[in-house]
């Protein structure tokens, strides 16, 4: 999707206005303590810009986790975020115990100039997502009239709307698409994310390499399909490589992952690659295990030898790493989505770590390297490479849908320029 034609915060006049801002404060918590404040820090530039440019107030709304519909458990409260935000901004943050309704509307109607207000978790109301589950696990659907009321109440909390929640941009939730204000702009985090993906997908540097890992082919069909129209080379690694190798080379894969559904379209994908002149690199050797366990016995295998019955491949071997390194060395732009082994376990992390080292090396020689959220972003955190690649996405699902060529509802809803 083209992202260059949307209103962004730097072009929005906020002076004297109440800004209602959707952020992504869905942070990990343990015993009501925040264990990683990255997402809160990521929203600070947009908040500060509004305050520095004379906004009357900044009203922040976010979800946290996925609470049941009904009584609101403390562990899903955004109260601890207000405390963290106060220390990051160096100014008071008013926390409200709800996100809609007469009391919230009153508190946000005419606040003191320069106020920062944080609303309670949006998902305490089923109207945010439109559906949910009650405490017994029964499905609950929101009534259309109540969704309208919920959206109207959110719309009363500001004069202009800013969306800086890239991580939720693929969800058509009320706070993402239902705030009805004349000007709706993307915040700085949203802008940074969209700029990277726009550049990568709309005018890539070439050769352009996609590294695709992860487990199931079926989950990645749309991704592979869309990227085959854009890239010059593709590494297909991780668990899904076994489905390709079994279909294409009739390789014995033991108890490695095999995706029945995905297997049906492997040949179509390969013929599309051939037609588009895309060079595909698959692994040629493996680190194997006698069970799916951190402390499993390990072995080695190649495509030619196959993996014996009762064993499974959990990482690529050193020959595969050499092939991957050659592909990385040829690239001027890389998008990486999905690890190439079970990186969480030391015995099976070498392949992903070796690939990460090559991607870092490529970045230092001027290659544009984009890590698409989720597990691959976790790899960056694990090996401290977040600042050694060009961009690590904050949105797993959102970045995946962009790479699949889908329109993101949260971006689509912003004002055109």
Curated annotation (Swiss-Prot):
The modification Phosphotyrosine is found at residues 76, 196. It comes from the Eukaryota. Gene3D superfamilies: Phosphoglycerate kinase, N-terminal domain. One of its GO terms (molecular function) is ADP binding. One of its GO terms (cellular component) is cytosol. Residues 191-417 are annotated as: Globular domain-2. Belongs to the phosphoglycerate kinase family. Residues 2-186 are annotated as: Globular domain-1. It comes from Equus caballus (Horse). Pathway: Carbohydrate degradation; glycolysis; pyruvate from D-glyceraldehyde 3-phosphate: step 2/5. CDP binds at residues 214, 219, 238, 338, 340, 343. It is found in: Cytoplasm, Cytosol; Mitochondrion matrix. Residues 187-190 are annotated as: Linker. The modification N6-acetyllysine is found at residues 11, 48, 75, 86, 91, 97, 131, 146, 199, 267, 291, 361. ADP binds at residues 214, 238, 343. The lineage of its organism: Eukaryota, Metazoa, Chordata, Craniata, Vertebrata. Monomer. Interacts with kinase MAPK1/ERK2; the interaction is direct, occurs under hypoxic conditions, and promotes its interaction with PIN1. Interacts with peptidyl-prolyl cis-trans isomerase PIN1; the interaction is direct, occurs under hypoxic conditions, and targets the protein to the mitochondrion by promoting interactions with the TOM complex. Interacts with mitochondrial circRNA mcPGK1 (via its 2nd stem-loop); the interaction is direct and targets the protein to the mitochondrion by promoting interactions with the TOM complex. The modification N-acetylserine is found at residue 2. Mg(2+) binds at residues 215, 218-219, 375. This is Phosphoglycerate kinase 1. Its main location: cytoplasm. Its EC number is 2.7.11.1, 2.7.2.3. The modification N6-(2-hydroxyisobutyryl)lysine is found at residues 97, 216, 220, 323. The keyword Cytoplasm applies.
């Amino acid at each position: 999707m083209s992202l260059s034609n949307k209103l962004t915060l730097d072009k929005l006049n906020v002076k004297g206005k109440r800004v209602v801002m959707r952020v992504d404060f869905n942070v990990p918590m343990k015993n009501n303590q925040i264990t990683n404040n990255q997402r809160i820090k990521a929203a600070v530039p947009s908040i500060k810009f509004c305050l520095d440019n004379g906004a009357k107030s900044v009203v922040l709304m976010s979800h946290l986790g996925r609470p049941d519909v009904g009584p609101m458990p403390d562990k899903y409260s955004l109260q601890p975020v207000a405390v963290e935000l106060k220390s990051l901004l160096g100014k008071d943050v008013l926390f409200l115990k709800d996100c809609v309704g007469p009391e919230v509307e009153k508190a946000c109607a005419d606040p003191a100039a320069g106020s920062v207000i944080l609303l309670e978790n949006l998902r305490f109301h089923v109207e945010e997502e439109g559906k949910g589950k009650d405490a017994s696990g029964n499905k609950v659907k929101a009534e259309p009239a109540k969704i309208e009321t919920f959206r109207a109440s959110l719309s009363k909390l500001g004069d202009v709307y800013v969306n800086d929640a890239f991580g939720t941009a693929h969800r058509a939730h009320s706070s993402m698409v239902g705030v009805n204000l004349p000007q709706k702009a993307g915040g700085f985090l949203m802008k940074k994310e969209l700029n990277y993906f726009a550049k990568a997908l709309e005018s890539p540097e070439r050769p352009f390499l996609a590294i695709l890992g992860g487990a199931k082919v079926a989950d990645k069909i749309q991704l592979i399909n869309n990227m085959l129209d854009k890239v010059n080379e593709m590494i297909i690694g991780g668990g899904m490589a076994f489905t390709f190798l079994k279909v294409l080379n009739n390789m014995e894969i033991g108890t490695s992952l095999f995706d029945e559904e995905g297997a049906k379209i492997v040949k179509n994908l390969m013929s599309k690659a051939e037609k588009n002149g895309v060079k595909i690199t698959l692994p040629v050797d493996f680190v194997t295990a006698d069970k799916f366990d951190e402390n499993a016995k390990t072995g080695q295998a190649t495509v030619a030898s196959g993996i014996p019955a009762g064993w499974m491949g959990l990482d690529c071997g050193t020959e595969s790493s050499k092939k991957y390194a050659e592909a990385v060395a040829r690239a001027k732009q890389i998008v990486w989505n999905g690890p190439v082994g079970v990186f969480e376990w030391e015995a099976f992390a070498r392949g992903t770590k070796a690939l990460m080292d090559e991607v870092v090396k490529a970045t230092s020689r001027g290659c544009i390297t984009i890590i698409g959220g989720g597990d691959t972003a976790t790899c960056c955190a694990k090996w401290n490479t977040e600042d050694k690649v060009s961009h690590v996405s904050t949105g797993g699902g959102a970045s995946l849908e962009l790479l699949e060529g889908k329109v993101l509802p949260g971006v689509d809803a912003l004002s055109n320029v």
